[in-house]
């Protein structure tokens, strides 16, 4: 019997010292400060109009800090916090304070009934910087605060680094202090509703969210519920260049939308909200360049098409939008959506071949390492460009999806063309990259093999079009404990390779999305039992932890310190795998009856 997650299932699962309390659509992140009785609020915004460095947000201090809950005398209260997806509850010596989102820009603090109580916080509404010739001051965001209680005191005091704000109210029943952070020039305070109404609205939003998701096996229910919370919590509303409601990989570490992340996020959303899944794809396609290229990343104030490190060049991400769109169509058919996106995806496909094949041999290259999504992989240690099996496999899969799209749209001649092109490309990969002695596909640099052993050397398995003998050789590598097998699989560099580092990003750790791709590859080649084992292994690896992480140590299964938490595609593929596992077990039960 499958279970569907509930709010109770996630009570106190969200650790706000490490994981932001936020809400669907919001760019406000509430944290507990260093396990103390204080809070702070960060902004999930790059704000490049203030600091042009596109990664400055990673180092930016909180917008609001030293948030304290105070008593009648203005004393800061110690608290114990309890978390739920819809509300934080702070137990103090004078009663319960609560915090919920009234809307995506308004944090509502519910005061303990029958008390004189309030909040105090430090606001830093300006950014300043000393320069060689002087200094710069820029506004960050506007802030308003107000209450539906009788105000006993209200002070704004200039202090070093900003302003200290203190507001104390007579808290009869349902009294609230609202703090709103505005993304525009507005300074109109938000309407203050009774806290019971605010909490009911917040609770109903999350109940509605969880009601839409399919059931899974009970052993995965808690992490499954948390993964769906991440899929909701990481959503941001349309603003600026973000044209649709879309999901950030992490509101802490990855502010913006990334191309291939968006495709993987759509995998999960298709099970609960197909329109939201479609909008993940639309949000990326909205910014296609005239030459067909799609951006690496999109954020409120801009787009990332080029990067100047480790080399300068154009940057995108692997072309898996068509693959994801086909999966979405299989779950929730929409011919009009296929008709809408097909021409743009064809242009993106053409860009890869026209701008990333310097030797004109029909094998596509990565010109910038970051276009691979495998930023620090040892595949790029020896210079660029690199003709890698993974990008050419992605393109084969894209053309496989195009074949289906053309058939769906009644364009049979075009479907036949894509089928021929896909098989022709695969033949070139076999001719140029296959090493019969090694039993794998090498990446090429200056037409010479790069003998760095990674799972990406096995990627053509995923096409489902190789000979049985080739498939067998590739799977042998996958299962070899000295290479990619072992207790924690699949490492992103072979354990036998001198570049292997189990803790460092794409130089060895296990990534859930790569495992997902190989589950599909094994299924396509008729190895269902191995696919099930890898699926169960991946589900168990992720379930061992209280959060969903970017990657996992290939020796210990633990998330390294550098791995982002509340990570989107790990949550997404966990959801998709858990649903598949449940459907398989349900089918097995029916067969046995």
Where are these regions (language model features)?
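Aromatic-rich carbohydrate-recognition surfaces in CAZymes
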Residues: 255-368, 389-392, 396, 509-525, ...
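Terminal accessory carbohydrate-recognition/targeting modules of carbohydrate-active enzymes
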Residues: 1-219, 260, 272, 524, ...
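Short N-terminal secondary-structure initiator segments
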Residues: 186-195, 231-255, 311-350, 438-447
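N-terminal start-of-domain structural block
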Residues: 149-180, 218, 294, 299-300, ...
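Extended, well-ordered alpha-helical scaffold segments
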Residues: 194-201, 205, 219-226, 273-286, ...
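Structured, solvent-exposed acidic/aromatic patches
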Residues: 385-392, 412
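Extended glycan-interaction surfaces of carbohydrate-active proteins
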Residues: 217-256, 285, 290-311, 357-387, ...
């Amino acid at each position: 019997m499958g279970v569907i997650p509930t709010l109770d299932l996630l009570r106190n699962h969200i650790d706000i010292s490490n994981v932001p309390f936020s809400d669907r659509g919001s760019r406000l992140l509430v944290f507990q400060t260093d396990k103390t009785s204080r809070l702070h609020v960060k902004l999930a915004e790059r704000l490049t109009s203030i600091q042009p460095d596109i990664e400055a947000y990673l180092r930016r201090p909180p917008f609001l800090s030293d948030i304290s809950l105070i008593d009648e005398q203005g004393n800061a209260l110690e608290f114990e916090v309890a978390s739920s997806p819809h509300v934080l509850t702070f137990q103090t010596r004078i009663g319960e304070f609560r915090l919920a989102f009234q809307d995506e820009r308004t944090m509502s603090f519910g005061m303990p009934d029958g008390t004189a109580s309030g909040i105090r916080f430090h606001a830093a509404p300006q950014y300043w910087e000393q320069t060689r010739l002087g200094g710069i001051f820029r506004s960050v965001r506007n802030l308003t605060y107000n209450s539906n209680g009788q105000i006993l005191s209200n002070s704004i005091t200039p202090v070093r680094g900003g302003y200290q704000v203190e507001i104390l109210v007579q808290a009869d029943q349902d009294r609230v202090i609202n703090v709103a952070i505005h993304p525009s020039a507005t300074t109109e305070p938000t309407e203050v509703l009774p806290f019971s109404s605010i909490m009911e609205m917040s609770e109903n939003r999350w109940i509605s969210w969880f009601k839409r998701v399919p059931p899974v096996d009970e052993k995965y229910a808690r992490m499954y519920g948390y993964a769906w919370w991440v899929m909701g919590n990481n959503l941001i509303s349309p603003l600026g260049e973000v044209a649709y409601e879309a999901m950030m990989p992490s509101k802490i570490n990855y502010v913006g939308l990334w191309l291939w992340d968006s495709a993987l996020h759509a995998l999960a959303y298709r099970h609960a909200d197909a329109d939201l899944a479609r909008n993940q794809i639309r949000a990326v396609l909205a910014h296609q360049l005239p030459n067909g290229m799609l951006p690496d990343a999109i954020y409120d104030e801009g787009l990332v098409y080029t990067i100047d490190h480790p080399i300068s060049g154009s940057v995108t991400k692997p072309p898996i939008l068509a693959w994801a769109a086909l999966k979405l169509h299989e779950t929730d058919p929409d011919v009009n959506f296929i008709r809408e996106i097909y021409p743009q995806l064809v242009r993106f496909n053409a860009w890869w071949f026209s701008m990333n094949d310097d030797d004109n041999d029909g094998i596509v290259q990565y010109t910038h390492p970051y276009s691979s999504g495998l930023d620090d992989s040892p595949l790029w240690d020896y210079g660029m460009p690199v003709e890698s099996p993974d990008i050419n496999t992605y393109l084969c899969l894209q053309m496989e999806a195009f074949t289906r799209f053309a058939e769906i749209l009644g364009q049979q001649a075009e479907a036949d063309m894509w089928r021929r092109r896909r098989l022709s490309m695969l033949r070139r990969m076999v001719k140029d990259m296959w090493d019969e002695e090694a039993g794998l596909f090498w990446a090429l640099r200056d037409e010479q093999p790069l003998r760095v052993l990674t799972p990406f050397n096995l990627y053509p398995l995923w096409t489902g079009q190789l000979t049985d003998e080739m498939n067998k050789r590739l799977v042998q590598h996958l299962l070899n404990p000295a290479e990619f097998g072992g207790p924690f699989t699949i490492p992103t560099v072979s354990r036998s390779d001198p570049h292997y580092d189990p803790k460092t990003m794409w130089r060895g750790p296990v990534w859930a999305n790569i495992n997902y791709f190989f589950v599909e590859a094994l299924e396509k080649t008729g190895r269902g039992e191995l696919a099930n084992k890898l699926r169960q292994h991946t589900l168990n690896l992720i379930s061992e932890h209280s959060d969903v992480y970017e990657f996992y140590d290939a020796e210990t299964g633990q998330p390294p310190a550098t791995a982002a938490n509340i990570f989107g595609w790990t949550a997404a593929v966990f959801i998709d795998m858990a649903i598949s596992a449940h459907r398989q077990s349900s089918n097995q039960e029916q067969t046995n009856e």
